[in-house]
């Protein structure tokens, strides 16, 4: 090999060669990044969709918003600036129109519903044998087996269990109100109730939160699980480094999940030992197993989904609703008037009668619009050949989603969107132009929430009985409770402190 010229050899040994290689590497890196930026901004199949350039070239902005629990606010701000469809990452579009719901989540014109985005529904998130992760055929089979547990008839059969847990809540709160002690944290007490209720219906026994006035460890696990889910959603955005990034997550989070799985199995096995029929969710799964529709393993795997889906989100919705009621006196007064005009005594409030309360239903609807518990939605992915969403052709392999918060707070969809106004659901002409078809808090299509009626009915019962028995006063320190709560799958709510006064016998005069 011919020797380097003397001046080059001198340059190399003086360190110039190393510096030259460093410069070459830097230039190559800048060239590669520049090529990626140019492609994603001007040549990518999604380059024609509006959105900030920083989101077009990288997933970092949306990932950072997710990590801070601010993704709902971030995406909402983009829609206010760019319109009804926004490119929020290189391969992801967010929609806020009513028409997009069916295009994304429902079967349409012979085609199946769009597949779930595997960045979001990744294999590290939930057990693959659960209804959440199942493919379309398996999902349909499991859902058919679970559906009888959530039918109107089944709910009436489950009412004694539901009423018993709510009565325990009311009795515990009444004891606190009568003691003249410390303020009551409604966030905690609603959490106790929904976890005990779901535990009772899923496992045949409550978690004992109400009885002991303390959180069961499972309550904290669910919050940890939601935060871990957010971390996994973020790291899976950065393929092919997702596995490496996931390995950097605290091992304690993985250990907590294993402990949860073990506890679930123990409780399911204990429920299976119960002799005779019991009117709860598990009984219907057992019936399906006996009929050969589900395997015993599939029965076990669905139990944890029931806890994750049915407890925390209902508690979050309840707490939002009572806060919004307590900070809007006309709403509180009208709810009390409706209760007084409908019932003579608390015992009349049941699953059938509570559904006569039209204003209460409107209050819950408006609370779900104003503060949707699952605010960021569940993304899907278009097939390789592409799909039409909201009248627009969307290229293949594009992640598409409807962000509940952004859709429900958009002036494109609702009149006075930043105001809590239950009248919008009662035919008030001020809201005739509202795009109410965009309001889908339980989603649509074959994977919509199977427990929708259970959630509505349990919230109505709890709120009606609570307002029948108590006169709550929000503490000053909780006046700004709503501001800037972070969301990791669902919202992480701080304590909601109130003083409780037991209503006297004259609070609801006997009807003529």
Swiss-Prot record:
One of its GO terms (molecular function) is monooxygenase activity. The keyword DNA-binding does not apply. Induction: Expression is regulated by the secondary metabolite regulator cclA. It is a single-pass membrane protein. The chain crosses the membrane at residues 19-39. Its EC number is 1.-.-.-. Pathway: Secondary metabolite biosynthesis; terpenoid biosynthesis. One of its GO terms (biological process) is terpenoid biosynthetic process. It holds the Pfam family p450. Cytochrome P450 monooxygenase; part of the gene cluster that mediates the biosynthesis of astellolides, drimane-type sesquiterpene esters that show antimicrobial, anti-inflammatory, and anti-tumor activities. The first step in astellolide biosynthesis is performed by the sesquiterpene cyclase astC that catalyzes the formation of drimanyl pyrophosphate from farnesyl pyrophosphate. Drimanyl pyrophosphate is then dephosphorylated by the sesquiterpene phosphatase astI to produce drimanyl monophosphate which is further dephosphorylated to drim-8-ene-11-ol by atsK. This is Cytochrome P450 monooxygenase astD. The lineage of its organism: Eukaryota, Fungi, Dikarya, Ascomycota, Pezizomycotina.
